[in-house]
């Protein structure tokens, strides 16, 4: 069974835990309890492949920012979550993305941009703004509602598909790299 290490990042109060718990337990948590760090595991079937999702739900509060580098090192893919009714959380996405790229030392890291709380009428972030940002990053964008469960699975499963593509690209790049010839040596004593 293939394991995928997913990390959910974003500002405090955007619904990272609500999305994760909705996926894992089919339950909406409506009281806000700031997360320090929670880990969840769930076995699912995506495109006919049985997968084990290892999901790290992270702290959005700035006082826990020192912990970010550590979980960013171990994560394979990142759900970058903002709330559609919180412009600041949308603006913060750039900071999270840059930090992920720095820690991973790569421009090419599997990510999905997630606009959560799409069930709310009080939108301050336009869908087109988010689509344009995702397009500029070269990543998918999905609007979700942890409350109604709208596209929650889709967000996580899309990230798994992004990781799969990344893994395949990495393997094919390694196979094409010249100079990867094993040199055999003899030691004469």
UniProtKB/Swiss-Prot annotation:
Its main location: membrane. This is GTPase KRas. It comes from the Eukaryota. There is a cross-link at residue 170 (Glycyl lysine isopeptide (Lys-Gly) (interchain with G-Cter in ubiquitin)). GO terms for biological process: actin cytoskeleton organization; cardiac muscle cell proliferation; cytokine-mediated signaling pathway; epithelial tube branching involved in lung morphogenesis; female pregnancy; forebrain astrocyte development; gene expression; glial cell proliferation. Alternates between an inactive form bound to GDP and an active form bound to GTP. Activated by a guanine nucleotide-exchange factor (GEF) and inactivated by a GTPase-activating protein (GAP). Interaction with SOS1 promotes exchange of bound GDP to GTP. Ras proteins bind GDP/GTP and possess intrinsic GTPase activity. Plays an important role in the regulation of cell proliferation. Plays a role in promoting oncogenic events by inducing transcriptional silencing of tumor suppressor genes (TSGs) in colorectal cancer (CRC) cells in a ZNF304-dependent manner. A lipid is attached at residue 186 (S-farnesyl cysteine). A lipid is attached at residue 180 (S-palmitoyl cysteine). One of its GO terms (molecular function) is protein-membrane adaptor activity. A motif (Effector region) lies at residues 32-40. The modification N6-acetyllysine is found at residue 104.
């Amino acid at each position: 069974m293939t394991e995928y290490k997913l990390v959910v990042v974003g500002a405090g109060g955007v619904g990272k835990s609500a999305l994760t718990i909705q996926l894992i337990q089919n339950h909406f948590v409506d009281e806000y309890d700031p997360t320090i760090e929670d880990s969840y595991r769930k076995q699912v079937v995506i495109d006919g492949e049985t997968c084990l999702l290892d999901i790290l739900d992270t702290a959005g509060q700035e006082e826990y920012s020192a912990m970010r580098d550590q979980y960013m090192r171990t994560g394979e893919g990142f759900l970058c979550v903002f709330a559609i009714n919180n412009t600041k959380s949308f603006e913060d996405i750039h900071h999270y993305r840059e930090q992920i790229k720095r820690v991973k030392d790569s421009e090419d890291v599997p990510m999905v941009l997630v606009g959560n709380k799409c069930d709310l009428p009080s939108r301050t972030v336009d869908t087109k703004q988010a689509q344009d940002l995702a397009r500029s990053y070269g990543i998918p964008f999905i609007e979700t509602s942890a409350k109604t469960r709208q596209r929650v699975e889709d967000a996580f499963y899309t990230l798994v598909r992004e990781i799969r593509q990344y893994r395949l690209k990495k393997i094919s790049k390694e196979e094409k790299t010249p100079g990867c010839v094993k040199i055999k040596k003899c030691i004469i004593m």
